A protein has these predicted regions:
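Sec-dependent N-terminal signal peptides
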Residues: 5-14
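Sec/Tat signal peptide C-region and signal peptidase I cleavage site
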Residues: 16-20
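Low-complexity, acidic Ser/Thr/Pro/Gly-rich terminal tails and inter-domain linkers that flank the onset
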Residues: 21-44
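Short, solvent-exposed loop/turn segments enriched in Ser/Thr/Gly
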Residues: 42-49, 122, 141
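Asparagine-centered strand-capping/turn motif at beta-strand->loop junctions
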Residues: 52-58
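Conserved aromatic beta-strand anchor motif in extracellular beta-sandwich/beta-rich domains
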Residues: 68-70
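Intrinsically disordered, low-complexity Pro/Gly/Ser/Thr-rich segments with frequent PxxP/GP/PP motifs
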Residues: 72-108
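Terminal connector regions
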Residues: 101-152
Length: 152
């Protein structure tokens, strides 16, 4: 079961990192899972270390959430702690938590891990972006196929 939650953490974090490339001035140089530890049978916390280039001004991203759907049904949801991206290329640690959705049992997660097909998964993603001038953007990406992020 922990393998499936690790997969969900990787998916959500990878999507956040991949989605960041769509914000003007961001480029992802590299990323890796730094740590993963279970918080229960249905959730885990973890961190990803990423090298991110930002050619724009410093921006703070908050309210970072993602929901993973399997065959159109809620499967897992995750949140990432707020992060500030400074101008230039720097290494950041992104911390987050992933939980299985209500109605998804540990056995469902194990079965999904054993029969994983990328075509079965879609992701909703939201983030608030605060610019140096105080302007806030609320970004929503809904129903994006997981394959969209894995091709990057």
């Amino acid at each position: 079961m922990n393998k499936k939650l690790i997969l969900a953490l990787v998916l959500i974090t990878s999507c956040f990192i991949a989605e960041a490339q769509y914000f003007t001035g961001f480029s992802i140089k590299s990323y890796r899972i730094s740590s993963v530890w279970p918080t229960s049978f249905r959730s885990l916390r973890g961190s990803v270390t990423a090298s991110i280039g930002n050619t724009g001004d410093t921006r703070k991203m908050s309210g970072i959430t993602a929901k993973v759907y399997r065959n159109g049904k809620p499967f897992a949801q995750g949140v990432c702690e707020d992060v500030t991206f400074n101008k230039g290329t720097s290494t950041y640690t992104l911390n987050g938590e992933v939980k299985l959705s209500d109605g998804v049992s540990t056995w469902d997660a194990i079965a999904a891990a054993l029969s994983f097909r990328v075509s079965e998964y879609t992701i909703d993603f939201t983030v608030n972006i605060k610019h140096p001038d105080g302007k806030m953007d609320y970004v929503v990406r809904a129903g994006m196929p997981l394959s969209h992020y894995l091709r990057r």
